[in-house]
């Protein structure tokens, strides 16, 4: 574990040396271009590096992270990432991943966070109000916050479907294009896939009726740099 700044550099040298020893062309191949099939939208929490939990390598995940894994429809940073991932990289899967024991979720629930972070997590406060009865029905606070983490992920997926970028991709029927909702349990290291209310969203007109539950599994990608 890196405890000092110099440890980061030393660890990098060791890691790069080991990689090159095992695969001499690893970095030259990696430098040519990227072609990730996945866009990962996750929390900024230092315990949330998805490549570690999924045993993936550099070049496999296009990543956007922020506090409490928000999909903000007014965040130019996020929307630029989404546009590039969908329209240029042609990712087939978008994964919104939250986690249990999330500090942002807990702070928003208790209403104690202020400043810019308070503004950023206001949408979670709205979830607390909208699902007040469901949350209060759970006596254990930790389990209540776990449910809020799950509700937050599902809400962010719904926000994704509201974007013109995703709507355009759905209308063009991009082969294999799917959006997934995950929650990571840090206490076990395991990922939980959440069920999405697809039929309800179709009834609301959020998702075209022509969109299938499993739109295909075409794994072909062109490589692009950024």
What are these regions (language model features)?
Residues 58-69:
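Glycine/charged-rich beta-loop-alpha catalytic/anionic-binding loops adjacent to active sites
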């Amino acid at each position: 574990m890196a405890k000092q700044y110099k440890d980061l550099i030393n660890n990098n040298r060791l890691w790069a040396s080991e990689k090159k020893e095992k695969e001499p062309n690893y970095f030259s191949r990696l430098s040519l271009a990227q072609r990730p099939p996945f866009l990962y939208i996750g929390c900024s929490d230092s315990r949330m590096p998805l490549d570690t939990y999924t045993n993936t390598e550099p070049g496999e995940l296009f990543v956007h992270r922020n506090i409490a894994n928000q999909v903000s429809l007014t965040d130019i940073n996020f929307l630029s990432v989404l546009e590039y991932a969908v329209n240029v990289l042609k990712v087939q899967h978008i994964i919104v991943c939250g986690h249990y024991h999330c500090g942002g979720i807990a702070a928003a629930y208790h209403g104690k966070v202020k400043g810019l972070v308070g503004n950023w997590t206001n949408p979670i406060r709205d979830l607390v109000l909208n699902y007040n009865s469901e949350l209060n029905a759970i006596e254990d606070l930790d389990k209540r916050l776990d449910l809020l983490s799950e509700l937050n992920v599902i809400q962010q997926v719904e926000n994704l479907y509201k974007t013109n970028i995703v709507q355009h991709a759905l209308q063009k029927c991009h082969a294999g294009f799917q959006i997934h909702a995950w929650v990571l349990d840090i206490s076990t290291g395991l990922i939980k896939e959440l069920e999405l209310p697809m039929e309800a969203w179709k009834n609301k007109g959020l998702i075209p009726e022509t969109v299938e539950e499993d739109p295909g599994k075409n794994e072909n990608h062109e490589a692009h740099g950024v």
